Amino acid sequence: MYEYLDRRYALALYEVAEENNKVDEYLRDLKEVVNIIKNSEDICKILKHPEINTSRKKEIFTELFKDKVDDKILSFLLVLIEKDRILYLEEKLKEMEKIYLEKNNMILANVKTVIPLLKEEREELIEKLGNKYNKKIILEEEIDKSIIGGVYVRVGDDVLDGTLSTRLKDIKKMMLKRE
């Protein structure tokens, strides 16, 4: 249920951003606000405190962000405070990023490897995934020593797991079944 609300809030803000030709700026501003909230215990305490009323919370946010973010972003934040949804801002940001990717015919591919991909490997992976999904691929790379070797790719709900750790687990299961 809340995912639907997150999507609606994100879509509304995205449309405002698009009308003002500020989609990238709004995404950047929202990321900054999310990071500030996540990394500040004081802000979290204020937002969660039942004895601090909504008006005071809105005043605090206005003081904090009035010169740091676009007025429309600030208005959006104040609406979220009013509706008691500000603590879920990160979900709205993620939905807005999804909308951005959809509208620009792009898709995010999460890639895990033990060592960084070489330029040629990265380009080949982007090309193959682009052909498979018929979209521009945004590669998000992560180094993960626990996979031992190989590559793990997640695109949306699709997973391509060519990791050595998974192969070893599969072999172990197969050997245990034979006993």
From Swiss-Prot:
Pfam families with a match to the protein in the record: OSCP
Membrane topology: Peripheral membrane protein
SUPFAM superfamilies: N-terminal domain of the delta subunit of the F1F0-ATP synthase, V-type ATPase subunit E-like
Main location: membrane
Transmembrane segments: none
Cysteine disulfide links: none
Localization per record: Cell membrane
A GO MF label: proton-transporting ATP synthase activity, rotational mechanism
InterPro entries to which the protein is assigned, alphabetical: ATP_synth_OSCP/delta_N_sf, ATPase_OSCP/d_CS, ATPase_OSCP/dsu
Keywords (A to Z) from UniProt: ATP synthesis, Cell membrane, CF(1), Hydrogen ion transport, Ion transport, Membrane, Transport
Subunit (UniProt): F-type ATPases have 2 components, F(1) - the catalytic core - and F(0) - the membrane proton channel. F(1) has five subunits: alpha(3), beta(3), gamma(1), delta(1), epsilon(1). F(0) has three main subunits: a(1), b(2) and c(10-14). The alpha and beta chains form an alternating ring which encloses part of the gamma chain. F(1) is attached to F(0) by a central stalk formed by the gamma and epsilon chains, while a peripheral stalk is formed by the delta and b chains.
Name under which the protein is recorded: ATP synthase subunit delta
Organism in which the protein naturally occurs: Clostridium botulinum (strain Okra / Type B1)
Origin organism lineage: Bacteria, Bacillati, Bacillota, Clostridia, Eubacteriales
